[in-house]
């Protein structure tokens, strides 16, 4: 297994971005932790004039994303980037989106066997001691690469909705909105860079 299997909750996040940007031309988008490439591929098909870049630390995931990009004939720039590196590519975007690892180790025992058997741990788990690890780092990067008024979108762990909102507000993001998924769980966040 090289990437997560796309889920309905991720489709809801994608729909939110499309509804916000469908009438805007030339939207510059960065997807962090692209995995299979499902987020940028759908955005590339629906937001026609968009310029999309996708990063992932895993070469296996990028191979899957490359194949999916070719199958779907979408123009996406894929790059192997570790979000925790201090020297990141110089990029400025209108939208930063991520469905990063967010399952804590203590939640592992309650997971379905097929997820553990078929999806990479690298894309799933965060330490119990720092469940917001990726959200914090991606938001830090967002402060540098999002244009003023740019939008940050996250898929989140339902157990940490309020904490993720507080994190973003504490970092200066504005109009932070927490949304529930189709199952009634806190699952998505949108926030603006001032």
Task: List each language-model region with its residue ranges.
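Proline-centered helix-kink/hinge sites
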Residues: 6, 100-101, 120, 148
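Conserved SAM/SAH cofactor-binding pocket of Class I
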Residues: 9-110
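Class I S-adenosylmethionine-dependent transferase superfamily signal
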Residues: 17, 43, 115, 138, ...
């Amino acid at each position: 297994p090289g990437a997560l299997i796309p889920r309905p909750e991720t489709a809801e996040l994608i729909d939110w971005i499309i509804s916000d940007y469908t009438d805007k031309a030339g939207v510059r988008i960065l997807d962090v932790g692209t995995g299979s490439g499902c987020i940028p591929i759908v955005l590339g098909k629906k937001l026609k004039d968009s310029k999309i870049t996708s990063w992932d630390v895993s070469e296996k995931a990028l191979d899957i994303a490359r194949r999916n990009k070719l199958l779907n004939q979408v123009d996406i720039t894929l790059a192997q980037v570790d979000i925790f590196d201090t020297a990141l590519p110089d990029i400025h975007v209108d939208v930063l989106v991520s469905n990063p690892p967010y399952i804590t180790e203590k939640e592992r025992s309650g997971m379905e066997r097929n997820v553990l058997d078929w999806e990479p741990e690298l894309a799933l788990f965060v330490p119990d001691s720092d469940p917001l690890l990726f959200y914090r780092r991606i938001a830090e990067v967002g402060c540098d690469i999002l244009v003023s008024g740019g939008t940050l979108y996250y898929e989140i762990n339902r157990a940490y909705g309020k904490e993720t909102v507080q994190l973003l507000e504490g970092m200066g993001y504005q109009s932070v909105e927490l949304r529930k998924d189709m199952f009634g769980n806190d699952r998505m966040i949108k926030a603006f860079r001032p």
